[in-house]
Amino acid sequence: MAGVTQPKPAGASEPPFARAASQASIELYWLPLGAGGWLVRLNGRIYEAIHAFLERRRPLDLYHSALIVQVPEGRFVIEDAWPIPDADGPSSRGVAVEGPVGSRRMARWRVFRYEVRRWRDGVIADASEAVASPQLLSDDPLVARRLLDVVGSLPSPVWGRDELKTGEMWNSNSVIAWVLAQSGLSTDAIGPPAGGRAPGWQAGLITARHQQLSDEQAGHGAGDATSRVGRPGVAATA
């Protein structure tokens, strides 16, 4: 397993997916929150301005994270997305898990659900705007396969709320942090670009650690996802 490599500078001209099909890798992408969408970007700035004021610090850039995982069998995009564009996620976008947004009561409608993709040959929207990316986290094929395996075992707490009592709301960064931790990778040196932060990241790490401790106490292996926090998937009726 390789350590975290020095990231490429922002705007690097090398195509982000230019890798040999037989090479194994786990690459992390940091995308500015709201890249390609002014409303999300505006809401993010307001959110960060409020938090910066309350914490008596300067506002930081906010980031959304995603992964590209290469194994000999193919290349996969791991990303949390909301809103869900249509009902064809499992077949067209490799959706592995869905969860509620804002409230479980509203999750019967697709607009109030998020989806976690394990998308073969998928794309990351606005990948060209990623900052200090990609970061190579591992080139170990066993770790890469393990990461792909654990995606389907993700908990599905309410997006945008601290349902798991971690001190942070659950969001897309929580998903990426959780799968990295559950894959066995060290997350100590992983973080957003300088001058930025990734809300929800610690929620994913804390949840993964709680599950690992629960599994150990129950006599399961570290990689066994028998113990769950939250409920994987929600019924889709819209």
What annotation goes with each model-predicted range?
Residues 193-220, 236-238:
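Short terminal or interdomain "cap/linker" segment that borders an active site or interface and mediates
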Residues 7-9, 217-218, 226:
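Intrinsic disorder/low-complexity segments enriched in polar/small residues
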Residues 221-226, 232-233:
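Compositionally biased, low-complexity flexible segments
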Residues 161-169, 189-198:
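Short, surface-exposed recognition loops or helix-turn segments adjacent to catalytic cores
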Residues 2-166, 210-213:
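Non-catalytic ligand/cofactor/substrate-binding and regulatory segments of enzyme domains
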Residues 74-75, 181-189:
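Short helix-capping/linker segments at secondary-structure and domain boundaries
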Residues 62, 160-183:
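Active-site nucleophilic cysteine motif
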